[in-house]
Swiss-Prot record:
Pfam families with a match to the protein in the record: Ribosomal_S9
Domain of life where this protein originates: Archaea
Location of the region described as Disordered in the Swiss-Prot/TrEMBL record: 111-136
Keyword Transit peptide on entry: no
The protein, known as: Small ribosomal subunit protein uS9
NCBIfam families: PRK00474.1, uS9_arch
Organism: Methanocaldococcus jannaschii (strain ATCC 43067 / DSM 2661 / JAL-1 / JCM 10045 / NBRC 100440)
UniProt record similarity statement: Belongs to the universal ribosomal protein uS9 family.
Gene name for this UniProt entry: rps9
């Protein structure tokens, strides 16, 4: 049947699942080809791991990414991480892994920062809201 690799990328509330399989170099985000993603800055962010890996590596695989939750840029970052992980795991190349880490660590490691939960006091204002202190 061929080699199949499944990876996950996360950013804030967005979760992306990438499935890499042997193919001709097609990459789709939520069934949309990566070339048709608009605006351009989102497409360029998604293309970073692909451009770093090179055409000869990408032309051997197809990657399908499904992204859910979060906002627009959170989804792009999650998809980017999932694509980066899928490429490295599919090729099994340590050089490529080191190249990705040297360029940007978030290509392989999900950003662990999450929104801080609201605290009980004055919870509608946010997690750290306090009344302003006056000295006079």
């Amino acid at each position: 049947m061929g080699k199949i690799v499944i990876t996950v990328g996360k950013r804030k509330r967005a979760i992306a699942r990438a499935v890499a399989r042997e193919g001709k170099g097609r990459i789709r985000i939520n069934k949309i080809p990566i070339e048709l993603i608009e605006p351009k800055y989102k497409r360029m962010k998604l293309m970073e791991p692909i451009l770093l890996a090179g055409e000869e590596v990408i032309s051997q695989m197809d990657i399908d990414v499904t992204v859910k939750g979060g906002g627009v840029m959170g989804q792009m970052d999650a998809a980017r991480t999932a694509i980066g992980k899928a490429i490295v795991e599919f090729t099994g190349s340590k050089e490529l892994r080191d190249k990705f880490l040297a360029y940007d660590r978030t290509l392989l490691v999900s950003d662990a920062r999450r929104t801080e939960p609201h605290k009980p006091s004055r919870s509608t204002k946010g997690p750290r809201a306090k009344r302003q202190k006056s000295y006079r």
